[in-house]
């Protein structure tokens, strides 16, 4: 089975909570989501994956792609069930603003994360969810 995974973000530290997804969309060239855990996909290579992941959006979906490649953002994804079981699904949002006009965001970042390399930028969100595939 294949599913669309759409991710949105809210700042619950303010009252009322504020949807900040539009800010990520506006700064698409400076943000990238990574899906890891018991997953196989661009940013993960689990030995016994329960699901596969692929990006379904690009920076140009949210506005003009002004710098470099038209890279995934990760707000829209395709998830496919591979095997039944229990595990974890981790969602990491990184902020990757340019440094001295040089982009930090690149197409190699998902594979860098999968191979254990340190990523540039800062972590905006890092959440782990229980994953059950039946």
Residue ranges and their predicted role:
Residues 1, 25-27, 83-85, 121-123:
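Solvent-exposed loop and beta-edge segments used for protein-protein assembly and interaction
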Residues 1-45:
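Extracellular-facing segments of soluble proteins and assemblies that are Gly/Ser/Thr-biased and enriched
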Residues 3-9, 71-112:
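Internal, hydrophobic beta-strand segments that form the core of beta-sheet-rich folds
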Residues 11, 97, 131-133:
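Beta-strand elements of well-folded, non-transmembrane domains
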Residues 19, 42-49, 104-113:
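Acidic Ser/Thr/Pro-rich low-complexity disordered segments
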Residues 46-81:
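A beta-strand/beta-hairpin structural motif
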Residues 104-134:
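Short beta-strand elements
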